[in-house]
């Protein structure tokens, strides 16, 4: 019987969290932005068990809903590279309009959205069936990260230089509203209403050690939360690349928001929907991205400055392992083999 790989954003992660453990094999897919390989980690053993090679300066990663392929952005060649999910071999290089960053996939798997950070900025739309670029949606400023909202209705793209959140109607593939921000937009996460519609965007901004809260219906910033301040001697101030706080994610059960601080070398846990600070865990140097296991019990933190991935027990708020990976690990995702 052929195995199938599924990427786990938002509500899909929550649904799979209810499956019996024996029904699925979980993998953490870890990019290495200064290397030429993407590594697959088995969270049962916390060891690297697979590797996609020959993608120099890989950045974003995603998996097709049918499990047939991995999508990985190649910064060195400005391409979207496709790897066979079974053999882990590269099968296709799709030329992009400019230098890419992160990736998102539509819920039906028919479209792949690529953040184009190179000027003037865009979201490239890839037709998954033909494996060609179907169109490019122009934005104001290069796009750092792109997401599909949990309900699949919108594509949300954040610009660092443009200092703007661009919201795209997924069906029309047109920008329907934008929101100017105080600083450049870094990672985002999406809180939902009981009906699954997007309620809030949590967004990190350049130069701010914390995150802002955007009311999706009102299309405006309604609050700003600063992370705890450490004594000067404990802060990291070098190599932050303009983002003292980079990386945040909501647990599949919807109860916890985890937020990274490169300046503090910590992951902070907030309750949802109240946003009460529950605690923190120290991790490796320059934590940059994170992803949850389907049961919401652990979070895997990519430490760009330590060339490692920290495994954090969410309830215990404690690092329980640190896994050596490649050079400058950043984006990571959770995938499941049913």
Annotate each predicted stretch with a short phrase.
Residues 19-338:
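Predominantly soluble domains enriched in secretory-pathway, periplasmic, or organellar proteins
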């Amino acid at each position: 019987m052929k195995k199938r790989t599924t990427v786990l954003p938002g509500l899909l992660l929550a649904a799979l969290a209810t499956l019996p453990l024996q029904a699925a094999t979980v993998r953490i897919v870890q990019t290495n932005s200064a290397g030429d390989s993407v590594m697959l980690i088995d969270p049962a053993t916390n060891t690297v068990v697979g590797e996609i090679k020959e993608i120099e300066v890989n950045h974003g990663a995603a998996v097709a809903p049918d499990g047939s392929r991995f999508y990985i952005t190649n910064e060195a060649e400005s391409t979207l590279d496709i790897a066979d999910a079974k053999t882990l071999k590269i099968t296709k290089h799709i030329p992009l309009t400019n230098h890419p960053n992160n990736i998102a996939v539509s819920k039906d798997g028919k479209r792949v959205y690529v953040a184009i950070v190179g000027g003037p900025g865009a979201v490239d739309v890839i037709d998954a069936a033909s494996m060609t670029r179907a169109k490019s949606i122009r934005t104001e400023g290069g796009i750092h990260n792109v997401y599909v909202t949990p309900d699949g209705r919108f594509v949300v793209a954040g610009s660092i230089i443009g200092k703007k959140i661009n919201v795209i109607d997924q069906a029309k593939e047109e920008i329907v509203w934008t929101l100017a921000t105080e600083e450049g937009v870094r990672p985002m996460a999406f809180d939902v209403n009981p009906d699954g519609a997007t309620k809030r965007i949590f967004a990190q901004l350049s130069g701010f050690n914390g995150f802002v809260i955007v009311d999706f219906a009102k299309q405006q910033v309604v609050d700003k939360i600063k992370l705890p301040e450490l004594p000067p001697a404990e802060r990291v101030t070098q190599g932050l690349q303009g983002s003292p706080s980079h990386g945040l994610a909501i647990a599949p059960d919807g109860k916890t928001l985890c937020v990274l601080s490169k300046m503090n070398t910590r992951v902070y846990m907030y309750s949802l929907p109240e946003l009460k600070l529950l605690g923190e865990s120290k991790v490796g140097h320059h934590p940059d991205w994170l992803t949850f296991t389907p049961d919401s019990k652990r979070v895997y933190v990519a430490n760009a400055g330590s060339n490692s991935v920290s495994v954090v027990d969410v309830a215990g708020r404690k690092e329980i392992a640190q896994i050596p990976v490649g050079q400058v690990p950043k984006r990571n995702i959770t995938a499941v083999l049913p």
